[in-house]
């Protein structure tokens, strides 16, 4: 059996732009992509903290160090500049891999720069047996 697990997320990034006339996607600062281990053209889920909307799109890289989080195409209707979002990527894992699985979490500052990276070793592994007593 394989389970779809959170691979990485960019937490509480601020939307910097919206371009309705572009074909689609989300443009993300290349430094954020590298820190999160998210690849160009990888599918991501975006959760808008301001309006509760969640949607899926794919990633294109923005200039490194720019802080850009730009929604393109139809996604531009789902957030406005200034909205805070969580950008999540997922991975399929075997049941044995899940036992030691922990995602990479990238925390950003007010300018969408990497503030802190919580890598797998910084988070507890998933407890497959349920809550401890």
Swiss-Prot record:
InterPro entries the record matches: Asp_de-COase-like_dom_sf, Asp_decarbox
CDD domains found in the cross-reference section: Asp_decarbox
Pfam family, one: Asp_decarbox
Recorded GO MF terms: aspartate 1-decarboxylase activity
Keyword Cytoplasm: yes
Metabolic or biological pathway: Cofactor biosynthesis; (R)-pantothenate biosynthesis; beta-alanine from L-aspartate: step 1/1
Protein localization: Cytoplasm
Cofactor: pyruvate
Reactions catalysed: L-aspartate + H(+) = beta-alanine + CO2
Main location: cytoplasm
Keywords: Autocatalytic cleavage, Cytoplasm, Decarboxylase, Lyase, Pantothenate biosynthesis, Pyruvate, Schiff base, Zymogen
The keyword Cytoplasm appears for this protein: yes
Gene Ontology CC: one annotated term: cytosol
Taxonomic superkingdom: Bacteria
Coiled-coil boundaries: none
Membrane-spanning parts: none
Record PTM text: Is synthesized initially as an inactive proenzyme, which is activated by self-cleavage at a specific serine bond to produce a beta-subunit with a hydroxyl group at its C-terminus and an alpha-subunit with a pyruvoyl group at its N-terminus.
Subunit structure, interactors included: Heterooctamer of four alpha and four beta subunits.
Summary of the function given for this chain in its UniProt record: Catalyzes the pyruvoyl-dependent decarboxylation of aspartate to produce beta-alanine.
UniProt-recorded name of the protein: Aspartate 1-decarboxylase
Organism: Desulforudis audaxviator (strain MP104C)
